[in-house]
């Protein structure tokens, strides 16, 4: 606990690139983090 290094938070967030996304999320083709 305390570290979410490999976790992708379950929030809907728009993005253009992976670095726009929190945690271990990547920017998916639909324009949202996942």
Curated annotation (Swiss-Prot):
Xref: SUPFAM superfamilies: Plant inhibitors of proteinases and amylases
Keywords, sorted A to Z: Disulfide bond, Knottin, Plant defense, Protease inhibitor, Secreted, Serine protease inhibitor
Compartment(s) of residence: Secreted
Listed GO MF terms: serine-type endopeptidase inhibitor activity
Pfam family, one: Squash
Disulfide bonds: 8-25, 15-27, 21-33
Positions of crosslink type Cyclopeptide (Ser-Gly): 1-34
Xref: InterPro entries: Prot_inh_squash, Proteinase_amylase_inhib_sf
Entry GO terms, CC: extracellular region
Domain notes: The presence of a 'disulfide through disulfide knot' structurally defines this protein as a knottin.
Function in brief: Inhibits trypsin; probably participates in a plant defense mechanism.
Family indicated by similarity: Belongs to the protease inhibitor I7 (squash-type serine protease inhibitor) family.
Protein name according to UniProt: Trypsin inhibitor 1
């Amino acid at each position: 606990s305390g570290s979410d290094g490999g976790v992708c938070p379950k929030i809907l967030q728009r993005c253009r690139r992976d670095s726009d996304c929190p945690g271990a999320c990547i920017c998916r083709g639909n324009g949202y983090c996942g």
